[in-house]
Swiss-Prot record:
GO terms for biological process: cytokinin biosynthetic process; cytokinin metabolic process; cytokinin-activated signaling pathway. A motif (SOFL-A) lies at residues 10-15. Domains SOFL-A and SOFL-B are required for function in cytokinin-mediated development. This is Protein SOB FIVE-LIKE 5. It comes from Arabidopsis thaliana. InterPro entries: SOFL (IPR044670). Residues 17-78 are annotated as: Disordered. Belongs to the SOFL plant protein family.
Amino acid sequence: MLGSSSGCESGWTLYLDQSVSSPSPSCFRDSNGFDSRRRSKDSWDQNYVHQEEEEEEDDLSMISDASSGPRNISEEDSVKKINIVGLKKQCKREKKRRDYEKMNSLLDDTASSPLFNFPHMLQKSVGGNKIEQTFPESTLDYSQGFSATQFQDKTAFQEQCGYLHMETRF
């Protein structure tokens, strides 16, 4: 794994792998267990200070390497996903509301429906031909007698447009 990294690893991971697998040159020991390089105290101090400065520079590069790794889900992406889920739920609620209102409008009182504006005729389509049927007067009397609405005289405008004015009694 030395010197190579896959797309998923950052420089920090690579650094940790290298530090474990390859010892630093100052750690080499001879067969007796002593450092193979003998140094004077001054050279040791200078070398130690120099190594410390390099480590600080390496530390900074390790931080930038680690932060420049592959991008996980960003905050913007997660917010977009949440918004999309919220919009889908809102659309479902709106559809349910519209369906409910539509169903309620279908359940309105049939005695006040536009069919009874023209009680003497009903056009029915059979095989592409319109057939006119008349209702018996008793049918209209029955529905009006048991309705909660009362029909009043229509104005000339209402007669032309086919509007029905109704009054509710309680």
